[in-house]
């Protein structure tokens, strides 16, 4: 937390939200309060999100009400997708009742053979399959619908696909309370960066095509 706060301030960020996918996982009040206590000693404003599921396994719900009361600003299993649609929907309903956001990492591993690189021309050149955009788009489509039906405030994290962008726009027009965010590298680089920078350009979700980049912008 301390070094993160220092680098955030150096980069011009005066308010940040810490994710819950840490060790230990922020899925209980003791860990949450410990993190918030540490954060309170820093020179920037630091909020803490709590996990949606215990140990980020997507199976057992945390006590959202108790965690919110203890200071959680929202809920996320950041970095790990919620594959069970019913579980995800119930989490949205609970978050809606508490008036807090749910943030979702959208990659269905069933479609992915190699993490970190887009399934496309670059992966073909390297002789691997990679991670196709449908891995993201399929979960974005599902969760946009769940957001519409639940009425929850839902954030689609680090969006990488142009189709995903259009899905969010479509469901926002239908009345869903949706938001999406993109990283600087996803709107400034493409899959071609892997050929130049190697593993430094591999990430989840991966850098995609120029068309995707333009749609994200």
Residue ranges: model-predicted function:
Residues 55-61:
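Structural motif
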Residues 21-25, 52-55, 81-82:
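Short histidine/acidic/glycine/proline-rich micro-motifs that form metal-
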Residues 13-18, 45-47, 119-128:
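Gly-rich Lys/Arg/Thr-decorated short loops/hinges at beta-loop-alpha junctions or inter-strand turns
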Residues 28-30, 44-46, 95-100:
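Short acidic, glycine/proline-enriched helix-loop-strand junctions
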Residues 35-41, 64-69:
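Acidic (Asp/Glu)-rich catalytic clusters
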Residues 37-52:
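A glycine-rich helix N-cap at a beta->alpha junction
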Residues 1-39:
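Metal-associated gating/positioning segment near the N- to mid-region
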Residues 61-217:
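Histidine/acidic residue-rich metal-binding segments in metalloenzymes
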């Amino acid at each position: 937390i301390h070094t993160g706060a220092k680098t955030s301030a150096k980069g011009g960020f005066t308010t940040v939200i810490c994710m819950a996918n840490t060790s230990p996982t922020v899925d209980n009040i003791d860990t949450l309060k410990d993190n918030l206590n540490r954060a309170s000693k820093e020179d920037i404003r630091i909020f803490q999100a709590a996990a949606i599921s215990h140990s980020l396994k997507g199976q057992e719900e945390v006590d959202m009400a108790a965690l919110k009361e203890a200071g959680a600003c929202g809920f996320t299993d950041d970095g790990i997708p919620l594959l069970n649609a019913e579980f995800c929907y119930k989490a949205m309903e609970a978050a809606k009742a508490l008036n807090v956001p749910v943030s979702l990492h959208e990659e269905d591993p069933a479609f992915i053979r190699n993490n970190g690189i887009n399934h496309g021309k670059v992966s073909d050149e390297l002789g691997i399959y990679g991670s196709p955009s449908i891995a993201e788009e399929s979960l974005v489509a599902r969760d946009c619908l769940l957001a519409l039906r639940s009425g929850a405030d839902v954030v689609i994290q680090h969006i990488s696909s142009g189709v995903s962008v259009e899905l969010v726009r479509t469901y926002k027009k239908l009345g869903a309370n949706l938001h999406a965010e993109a990283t600087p590298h996803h709107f400034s680089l493409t899959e071609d960066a892997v050929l130049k920078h190697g593993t430094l350009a591999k990430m989840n979700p991966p850098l995609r095509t120029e068309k995707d980049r333009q749609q994200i912008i």
